[in-house]
Amino acid sequence: YWQNYPKFMVSFMKAMWGDAATAENDWAYHYLPKLDVPAYDVLRIFEMMDQGRCNIYFCQGFNGLLAFPDRGKVTRALSKLKLLVTIDPLETETSRFWENHGDHNDVDTAAIQTEVIQLPSSCFAEDEGALVNSGRWLQWHWPGAEPPGEAKLDTWIMAQVFLRVRDLYLKEGGVFPDPIVNLTWDYADANEPTPEELAKEMNGR
């Protein structure tokens, strides 16, 4: 099975960058970021934050302030960011880490310069698509209700981030805009790819 890995890789690169990925440029392999360490997992990212080596963090459906054992270190790390964006159906401790609540969150709010943007997202029951779990179940589900208020689907939120970043690169250029401006984004509605489109693409459409 894995003897077909080169074919899988080419299929992936063509799905990502379409006509910009050719045999002549090694299927745009140079577009992919290369690891200089074994992995950039969430533990390493927070360590880099604490060292002042990470300026922006998108926190999607994750409450780091409660997930990690060293709350003080996580707060210190978040305080060193220039920008924190949280995407979550609920207001989390991470999204409000800068607020002083006495013994529950004793921080110096005035000393924290991190800009925090909270983007309300839908919860799983308001979304459509695939669910997997540790029991290896793969289930497709449909929304039970519309997201309340200003909450949006994660796909809509991430699409808006991508489209705006791409527009900035197209207008202003940059050090290496090619992976962003050449990214394939040929969905029926560019503002909100459907779960069906995404599932087909991941399966090698």
Regions found by a protein language model. Name each.
Residues 1-204:
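Non-catalytic alpha/beta scaffold blocks inside enzyme catalytic domains
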